[in-house]
């Protein structure tokens, strides 16, 4: 009987130790660096597991902060940087292909006029604020959101929503292309916008407070419309999701 109790006590202690280890919070490791960037320079971030947040500021430099979330079974990644006076390119470098990728979340500050020519992640959201240069952003599983856009935007998602709030419309020669497969698209325009809209959804609705005639019934719907005198081409496409085009209440 004594041996049985001792055995049960040992098993209980082992189970408790395993549960404690599995419940241990993941470790966070922070890396940060700054690089000068010429006016109108280019910034790119390539990631796999984790989000990308970019914010514009008044300094002529790029500040990159990477936060790695080291959970059980993951190995620390390296942060690769290629830089020149006109370009800063950041990439997550994993030690081995057969290991589970560690989560790396990027927080990046860039000059307001910088061009974001390649914000890429596989599993994670992309958020952009107060950047007035051209933007190209792509994620497979995550949302894309930009506040204060004023130039060409190319945003693509597979499973995720896209939200774009424009401070000003780009020039007539520029384009806005927002595309997702499984997700909604929300576009907020200045109230006196001049643009040419092309919208299409296969299983969803198109709604707008800027257009006179819109589709209120779900289904395979395509709509073209000109706002004001026309201008930059705006293409909004989703397969399974709704599209909305409304005034940006923060811009008059």
Can you describe what each PLM-predicted range is?
Residues 1-252:
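Intrinsically disordered, low-complexity terminal regions
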């Amino acid at each position: 009987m004594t041996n049985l109790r001792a055995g049960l006590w040992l098993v209980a202690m082992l189970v408790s130790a395993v549960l404690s280890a599995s419940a241990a919070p993941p470790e966070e490791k922070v890396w940060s660096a700054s690089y000068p960037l010429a006016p109108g320079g280019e910034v790119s971030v390539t990631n796999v597991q984790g989000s990308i947040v970019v914010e514009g500021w008044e300094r002529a430099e790029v500040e990159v902060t990477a936060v790695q979330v080291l959970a059980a079974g993951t190995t620390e990644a390296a942060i690769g940087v290629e830089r020149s006076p006109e370009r800063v390119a950041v990439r997550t470098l994993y030690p081995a292909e057969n290991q589970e990728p560690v989560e790396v979340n990027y927080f990046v500050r860039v000059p307001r006029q910088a061009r974001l020519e390649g914000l890429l992640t596989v599993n994670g959201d992309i958020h952009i604020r107060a950047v007035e240069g051209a933007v190209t952003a792509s994620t497979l599983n995550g949302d894309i959101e930009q506040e204060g856009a004023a130039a060409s935007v190319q945003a693509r998602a597979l499973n995720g929503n896209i939200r774009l709030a424009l401070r000003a419309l780009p020039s007539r020669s520029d384009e806005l292309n927002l595309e997702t497969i499984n997700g909604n698209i929300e576009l907020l325009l200045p109230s006196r916008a001049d643009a040419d809209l092309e919208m299409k959804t296969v299983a969803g609705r198109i709604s707008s407070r800027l257009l006179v005639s819109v589709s209120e019934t779900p289904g395979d719907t395509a709509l073209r419309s000109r706002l004001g005198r026309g201008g930059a081409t705006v293409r909004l496409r989703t397969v399974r999701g709704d599209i909305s085009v409304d005034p940006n209440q923060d811009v008059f």
